[in-house]
Amino acid sequence: MTANVPMINSHSAERRVVRTLVVDDSVVVRTVIERILNADPHYSVAHKTSNAEQALGYLADHVVDLVLLDIELPGQSGLAALPQILRKNPSVKVAILSGKCEEGSAAAVEALALGASDILSKPGSGSFGEQFPQALIDRLNRLFDERPAVPSMQRHVTSPSPDNASAPLACIGIGASTGGIHALGQLFEGLAAPLGVPVLLTQHLPASFTVYFAQQLARMTSLRVKVAETGDLLQPDTVYVAPGDANIQLRRSLHGRAMVLLNPERTASGNLPGVDPMFASMADIFGAGAAGIVLTGMGRDGTSGARDIVAAGGWIVAQDEASSVVWGMPGSVVGAGLTCAVMEPLGMMNFVARRGKVAA
C-alpha cells in the first residue's frame, strides 16, 4: 500500500472545515483515512480511535461534524454505538465505513435505520486503490454540500394547521433519500391510529436493499408493508415500497380501483426509483385527495411531482431543515412554495391524517 494520497478535486470552495472522528480498529485504515481527509481543505481529522468506548468518551467532551464508523470493533460494535453517538450529538453525521456492510445487507439497512447518514464500502487491507480517495471525498461532499438557495424566511418551520384541505384524503405518497430510513422510523413511530388510506413510498435505494428495507420498515409500523408489484390493488393501511429498479405509478383497474403499474424507466433527473413519477401518478388518479410527504435527501427529486399534486388540489408536507440529514429534496419543495407545512417527521403522519379528515 502506498503512503501517497492522490490529488483530490473538491468543488465546495467556501464551505467550513468538517471536523471528523475516525473510528476503526485498523491502524492502517485510520492512517489512510486521516491522510485522505487532511489532504482536502474542507476536512480535518480531529481524532482517531480504535474502539467505540474511546469514541464515546471523546464525544463527551468534544464536538465533531462527522464520524466515520466501522461496524466490527473490539468490544462494543459500531451498530451498538451508533444510537449513543447520535444521542451525544444529534446534529453529527455518521457515515459507516466498513467492509461488512455490503450493498443490500441487513447490517447496512439496520445502520441506516439507526440513523447513519450513508454507507461507504471500505476496501480490504492493502487494497486502497487510486480511485478510493476521490470516491470517499465525493460521497462525503454530498452530505455537506447540499443546501439549496431558499429565502431565509422560508427556512423556518411553518405552523401546521389542519384547515384548508380541499378533499378527503385518499392516498399518501412519501419520498426520501439520504437519511430517509431513520426519518421514516420517526414518521411511523408518531402514527397514533390507522390511516384508512394506502401509502406509497419511494426511498432512494438500490434494488438489492429493497427486501431488507421492507422488512425493517415492517418492524417500525403497525401498517402492512410490501414491496410494490404491478397489479397490486391499493389497500388502506398498507405501505407499498418502490423496488430499487422501478418507479411506482398508478392506473385504474377495469373495476375502477387504483392499481400499481411499475415503470422501469429512469427519471429525467437520473433517479430510479423516482419520487416525481410517483407523485405525478397520484395527482392523476387521486387529484385533490393526494398528499405528499418529502423527507430528507439529496437533489430535487419530488419537486416536479409535488407541483403536479398541488396543481390537482392536493398538498405537500416537507421535513424541516434542522432534522434533515440533507435538506435538498425538502428544501427544494419549500423553495418552490409548494408546502402547506414544514415540520420534523415525528408528527407528520398524524398531521396528514387530521388534515385529510377535516376535508371529509
Descriptions of predicted regions:
Residues 1-22, 26-42, 48, 53-68, ...:
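Conserved acid/base catalytic micro-environments in cytosolic active-site loops
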